[in-house]
């Protein structure tokens, strides 16, 4: 039950109670006592997202069991964590779900339907992985996530593609099939959520001294780290010239051994940026942080 519900239920009870007293006693002055409770209910209804966020951020709860099971089934990084860090991971994912907007495109016939929980979870899991070692629980300038039923065109990129980042509006767009494929087929598949949120991280959260200086000459090394060539990644995204920091983020979490072997300096910078060393599978956090 959401925290705001604990306020509205008693208020509704007392409002109904006073209306009932007024009705059965034929004395409608009693109905006036219901007015404050109705006003409180209306205020809580309008402010419920903010109330729920404030309460749960101070007392974070882990994901519901069915979502945690889905996470444990598919997320390799999560499976290897210590029990304490699994709990932290779960809480960060839950807070990310609560603190961001997930919606369908206006052109979708099912626009009014809610985005399925598993699709939202895939994005939240990528965010929790990236932010596990940091105090942040979301990306301040990016709080809108659009899930399209298939590949999509946009005014910026008219061809069909699977993911895109709109920095100006703080929106990240994904196609649902590619999002699910990347999550359920890891590490063989390229995970779009990790890629795009890695881009978000380095454009909003990371300090400049922790951002590696990658250039296109290092594509061959990135390919050797993952066995994913540039063409494969481009076909997954649906756009040419993938962002190198997004690709590096993906490979850092999925192929840490080869990453450290082939690009040790970049690996260390990423460890500093994320405050994580994925080579230490059970406890990758370098310096402990408060949630």
Regions found by a protein language model. Give the residues of each.
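Active-site His/Glu-centered metal-binding helix of metallohydrolases
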Residues: 193-202
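A generic secondary-structure signal for well-formed alpha-helical elements
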Residues: 97-100, 201-205
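Short pre-active-site segment immediately N-terminal to the catalytic Zn-binding motif
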Residues: 175-194
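Short, polar/charged, Gly/Pro-enriched helix-capping and turn/loop motifs at alpha-helix termini
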Residues: 103, 207-208
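An acidic- and aromatic-residue-enriched active-site/binding cleft used to recognize and process polar
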Residues: 150, 177-179, 206
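N-terminal low-structure segments adjacent to metalloprotease catalytic domains
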Residues: 1-128, 132-133, 276-291
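Metalloprotease/metallohydrolase-associated module, dominated by Zn2+-dependent proteases
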Residues: 2-4, 120-131, 152, 158-161, ...
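Auxiliary, metal-adjacent structural segments of Zn-dependent hydrolase domains
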Residues: 100-173, 182-183
């Amino acid at each position: 039950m959401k925290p705001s519900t604990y306020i509205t239920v008693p208020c509704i009870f007392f409002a109904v109670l006073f209306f009932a007293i007024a009705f059965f006693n034929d004395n409608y002055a009693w109905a006036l006592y219901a007015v404050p409770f109705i006003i409180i209910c209306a205020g809580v209804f309008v402010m419920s997202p903010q109330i729920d966020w404030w309460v749960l951020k101070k007392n974070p709860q882990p994901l519901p069991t069915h979502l945690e099971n889905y996470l444990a089934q598919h997320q390799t990084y999560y499976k290897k964590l210590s029990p304490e860090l699994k709990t932290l991971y779960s809480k960060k994912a839950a807070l990310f779900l609560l603190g961001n907007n997930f919606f369908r495109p206006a052109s979708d016939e099912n626009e009014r339907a809610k985005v399925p929980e598993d699709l939202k979870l895939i994005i939240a899991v990528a965010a929790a992985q990236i932010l596990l070692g940091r105090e942040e629980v979301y990306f301040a300038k990016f709080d809108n996530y659009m899930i399209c039923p298939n590949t999509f065109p946009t005014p910026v990129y008219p061809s069909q593609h699977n993911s895109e980042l709109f920095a100006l509006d703080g929106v990240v767009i994904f196609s649902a099939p590619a999002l699910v494929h990347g999550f359920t087929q890891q590490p063989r598949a390229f995970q779009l959520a990790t890629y795009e949120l890695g881009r978000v991280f380095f454009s909003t959260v990371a300090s400049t001294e922790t951002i590696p200086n990658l250039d296109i000459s290092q594509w061959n090394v990135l390919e050797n780290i993952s066995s994913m060539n540039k063409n494969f990644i481009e076909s997954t995204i649906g756009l040419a010239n993938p962002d190198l920091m997004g690709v590096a983020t993906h490979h850092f979490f999925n192929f840490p051994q080869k990453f450290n072997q082939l690009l040790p300096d970049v690996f260390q910078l990423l460890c500093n940026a994320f405050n994580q060393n994925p080579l230490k599978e059970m406890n990758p956090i370098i310096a402990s942080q408060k949630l």
